[in-house]
Amino acid sequence: MNAHTLLSQSLVIDCHLDLLYDVLQKRRQGRRQVILNDYWADWRAGNISCIVSSLYCDDSCDYLSEALQQIAALEEEVAESTGEFFLATCAADIRHAQATGKVAVMLSFEGVEPLVGEVSLLRLFHKLGVRFIGFCWSRSNWAADGSRFKDALYIGYGLTEGGKELLALARKLHMLVDVSHINDLGFWEILNSAQQPVL
C-alpha cells in the first residue's frame, strides 16, 4: 500500500497546528482568505479531515484579547470561504468533514493564559468552541508549571490549586486534556486522575 492509498483510506487529524496565530498576524497585515490561500492545498494533499488549531499567545500580548481575536479571525475566514472548512466542536463534525471532503477546525488552548486566572472563563471559551486544553506552553503560568529545557534537575510544582479546579471543570465540560509542554509533576497529576483519554 502506498502513502496516497493509506491517506485516502484513513481519517487524518493534525492534532496541533499554530494556525490561528499565523492567520491573525497575516490578517493584521491586510490579507484575507489566508486559510484558503496558504493552507488549503496542503490539507487536501494530505487528506486531512480535522485540524486542531492552538490558541497560542506569546508573552508580549494581552492574552485574553489575543485569544478572542484568533477565534474571531477563524470566524472571518470561515465567512470568506465557500464552506471548505468550518469550526467543529464534536466527533460528528469530524466525521461529516471526512465524508464531505471538508476540514473540521477544532480549537485548543496552548497555555491557559487567556483565562487570566479566572477558571469560570473556561465555560465561555467552551461556548466559543474550544474543546482541547493544554495547561501551559512550556512557560509556567497561574495553573501549571511548564517543562524546562535548560535545567534537567528542575522538579517544579505541577498543577496549582487553580489548575486543579480548572482541570475539574475541563473534565465536567468533556474537554480533551493535552499534556504537552507541562512538567513531569503536572503530567502525572493529570494522568493519575484521568477518567478519560488524554493527549
Where are the regions that the model predicts?
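N-terminal hydrophobic targeting/anchoring segments and the immediately downstream early-domain regions
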Residues: 1-156
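Histidine/acidic residue-rich metal-binding segments in metalloenzymes
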Residues: 117-127, 131, 149-199
